[in-house]
Amino acid sequence: MVTIVDTLSNTPLRPRHPEKANRPDSISPAKPSWIRVKAPTTRGYADTRNIVRENGLVTVCEEAGCPNIGECWDKKHATFMIMGDTCTRACAFCNVKTGLPAALDAGEPEHVAEATFKLGLAHVVVTSVDRDDLADGGAAHIAATIRAIRATCPTTTIEVLTPDFLRKDGALEQVVAAKPDVFNHNLETVPSRYLSVRPGARYFHSIRLLQRVKEIDPTIFTKSGIMVGLGEQRHEVLQVMDDLRSAEVDFLTIGQYLQPTKKHHAVMAYVTPEEFSNYETVAYTKGFLMVSASPLTRSSHHAGEDFAKLKAARDALAR
């Protein structure tokens, strides 16, 4: 379980989630056997961690407490989280720090590009915190990062996982103009759970955001994901699939929600591997080019391999 308070040399710092500090604990059921993963101990993991530290970068792998960090970092795969480590939203599921972020680091795009080169990444995933404090939500910074990676690693394919740019006119267009290979924006949960899980966002705004990407540039792959185990019903998950297909989204990910701390939203259910397999089958019948659904599926897990499959699926349709 990840601590709610950041520490440095045993000295307590500010609460990681001050808005949650006084909430009563939410108790989740014990994790089933299919959820458990091994602690990261490999040389590849250590090498990736060193490259991240040397370039002064933040990864969502660490900040969000991803269960797949050992596997991904062993393969020198990492998802870079730009625009700082502090988010202006306070979603009930997320372990990223909340509060007032620091100013943007103008050198960050080049640092990310350099780390991408050092890791030898064929496919890189770049995500970010929400930056509601910025006029464009950080869109120009995301676009600059895409361009920096292109300049340094011209053969590397680029996937961005973006905020919703709520009430940020023109922001989405800046990111799309930089031409990422994959534009990912997660819905996170079904509409009925938004007020308790993702109160700062709007479900249909997120659907429209994904739809707009395809309208601006149909060649960009679009991707979205949800977590299950937050109290949703099966029919609601199927409706999300239909909504995403109506926006021409290509790739769907579905994973199990895991509670970061007892101050976060409780796990309401652990969805079985068989249920995930069924969701995957149904999603393919609805027309998604690529579907990843399993207890440990996360947005950037196996992103490189999945991009190759996604491209092959579209090429097959074109023939």
UniProtKB/Swiss-Prot annotation:
It comes from the Bacteria. It catalyses: [[Fe-S] cluster scaffold protein carrying a second [4Fe-4S](2+) cluster] + N(6)-octanoyl-L-lysyl-[protein] + 2 oxidized [2Fe-2S]-[ferredoxin] + 2 S-adenosyl-L-methionine + 4 H(+) = [[Fe-S] cluster scaffold protein] + N(6)-[(R)-dihydrolipoyl]-L-lysyl-[protein] + 4 Fe(3+) + 2 hydrogen sulfide + 2 5'-deoxyadenosine + 2 L-methionine + 2 reduced [2Fe-2S]-[ferredoxin]. Its cofactor is [4Fe-4S] cluster. GO terms for molecular function: 4 iron, 4 sulfur cluster binding; lipoate synthase activity; metal ion binding. GO terms for cellular component: cytoplasm. Residues 73-289 form the Radical SAM core domain. SMART domains: Elp3. It is an enzyme of class 2 (transferase). Binds 2 [4Fe-4S] clusters per subunit. One cluster is coordinated with 3 cysteines and an exchangeable S-adenosyl-L-methionine. Keywords: 4Fe-4S, Cytoplasm, Iron, Iron-sulfur, Metal-binding, S-adenosyl-L-methionine, Transferase. Residues 1-12 have a biased composition (Polar residues). Pathway: Protein modification; protein lipoylation via endogenous pathway; protein N(6)-(lipoyl)lysine from octanoyl-[acyl-carrier-protein]: step 2/2. [4Fe-4S] cluster 1 binds at C61, C66, C72, S300. Its main location: cytoplasm. Its EC number is 2.8.1.8. Belongs to the radical SAM superfamily. Lipoyl synthase family. This is Lipoyl synthase. It comes from Bradyrhizobium sp. (strain BTAi1 / ATCC BAA-1182).
